[in-house]
Structure formats: C-alpha cells, structure tokens
Amino acid sequence: ATSPRELGRKSLAVNLSDVAAMGAAPVASFLSLSLPPGVTGVWIDAFLAGYHALSTQFGVPLLGGDTTSARDRLTVSVTAIGRAENTHLKRRGDAKPGDRIFVTGYLGDSAQGLQDMLSGRDTPFIALHNKPEPFVNEGIWLGGRNEVHAMMDISDGIASDLLHILQMSGVGAEVSLDMIPTNTPIELAVAGGEDYKLLLTADVGAAARLAEDYKAKFGEPLYEIGRIVAGEEIRWLDRGNPVLIECEGFAHF
C-alpha cells in the first residue's frame, strides 16, 4: 500500500512535474485536503512530512490552502505555481515534421509497481510507483533550449500523451518500440502511465547536440524513440517493421 508520507510526497511531485514540463521553475504550491472520518492526526502529520520533504528539496514553499471534512472519501488538491521566460515556455502544440522524439527515462516502472502492489508481490517497482521523481531541473534546462519544440510529462502513458502533442501540433509520429527504454512488458511502457518522465520533440539538426549536452549536464541519457512526420497518427515500428498496438492510456473523465 501507499503510505501517507508517500502520498503526500507524490501529490506534490506530480504537480511539480506539470510545471517542469512547460520549461518553468516551480516557485510555490497550495494544498487543499478534504478529510473523511477516521483520518488521524498521525496520518496527517505523515502526509505533510512527505509533502514538506519534496517542497524543501526543490525550494517550493507551501503558501496556503484549505482543509475541510468529507463524508466518506479523501480528496487531495494541489496547485503549483511556476515562473518562466516567455521564450522558454514549452507547449504541446509546437512539434514540427522532422523533429526527433525523446523521453528522459525508463517507462512502465510505475504501472508495473501498481500491478505488483495490487497482486501482493514485493518488488522494487512499487517504490518507483509510490515515489516518482519529477524532472524539475531537467525541465527548466530544456525550457532554455530553442531546439526543443514541444514538451509535456508522461502521466497517462506515452500512447496517450504523445497523441496530445500530435493533435495539438497537427502532425503524426513514428515511434520505434525497440528504442523505448523499459524494464517491463512493452504494453506497460506504452500505456501504463504515471511515469512522469518528460516527453519532448527537438529540431532534427540539433537533436544529437541536445542529447550530448543533456548527458553532460545531468549524467543521464535523453532517449530518442522516434520522429515527427506529416499525418495525424502514431505509427508503431519494431526494428523498422510496422506493428499494431492496441492499448489506451489513462482517460480523464
């Protein structure tokens, strides 16, 4: 199960990830809790300790919020405020044909962790599900690179999230399944969600240099997984051969 401390940390992490995915620096957050009967002071203290640990790590103060009682269900609502130069903001609708597609880390770990947790298995993937690490400094740095065109974080699975970029940019994509970094079945890597890695497109002429500079700066690779093409859909390839992927990311209601 997810501990209250992990839940507190994760509730802020996913919001910092949203801010970083636009190339912005998070500067503050607001937290609202709706608490059902049975939630103890010990639980609340642990939740806030997890939240505070991450806010301290990235220097993002909690400036306020609200606490109310609920009839039967816990609700956590976080708002993160970010700041960026206008020229550094990265949006979903700016991908261009020829762009190379990158992700900043392994995909599928969180979905595997959720499966393992629900089935009672004790594996290292569970910690990756409960404690996602937002790419805050990486997002800020990528925001300052003009060759990065479109960017977002992967919260719903790359099959779903890449489609958002394509639809808003009016383009298509070719993605090589064999190039996707993963330790899990490819279905989880493609559609699992809650990975909170950054997904970005970069100008083809500067993509190799971008990857080199990123590796030099952060000590981790940018993983190239495909390219933007004309069209309006994702073509999935496996070692150059077209394949059919039937899976959906998380669908918001």
What are these model-predicted stretches?
Residues 81, 199-203:
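Short hydrophobic/aromatic beta-strand micro-patches
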Residues 1-14, 38-49:
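Glycine-rich anion/phosphate-binding loops
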Residues 112-128:
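Short, compositionally biased
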Residues 25-115, 227:
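Glycine-rich anion-binding loops of enzyme active sites
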Residues 38, 112, 130-194, 238:
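Active-site-proximal betaalpha loop/short-helix elements
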Residues 130-133, 211-253:
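Acidic, Ser/Thr/Pro-rich beta/coil linker or hinge segments at domain junctions
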Residues 15, 23, 62, 98, ...:
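Residue-level signal for inorganic ion chemistry
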Residues 41-42, 89, 205-213:
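Short, conserved charged micro-motifs
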